[in-house]
Curated annotation (Swiss-Prot):
Record gene name: cxgS
Protein name: Cytochrome c oxidase subunit 7s
Any Gene Ontology CC annotation: mitochondrial inner membrane
Record's subunit section: Slime mold cytochrome c oxidase consists of at least seven different polypeptides species, subunits I, II, III, IV, V, VI, and VIIe/s in order of MW.
Function in brief: This protein is one of the nuclear-coded polypeptide chains of cytochrome c oxidase, the terminal oxidase in mitochondrial electron transport.
Lineage, opening ranks: Eukaryota, Amoebozoa, Evosea, Eumycetozoa, Dictyostelia
Spans through the membrane: 13-35
Amino acid sequence: MTHALPKVVKSQLVQDIGVALILGSIAGCFFKYGVDKKKQRERVAFYEKYDKEDL
């Protein structure tokens, strides 16, 4: 007689890990591209300030 509990635990772990990977990937991409856009805006503003100044 085999117990169903190990199968349930295994399937739940696989499901939890899958959900964590999906949510982690989405959050990671959002953070990466959000931070890159912020740095790019800061860089553009920085150089625009120097372009307006007379040297």
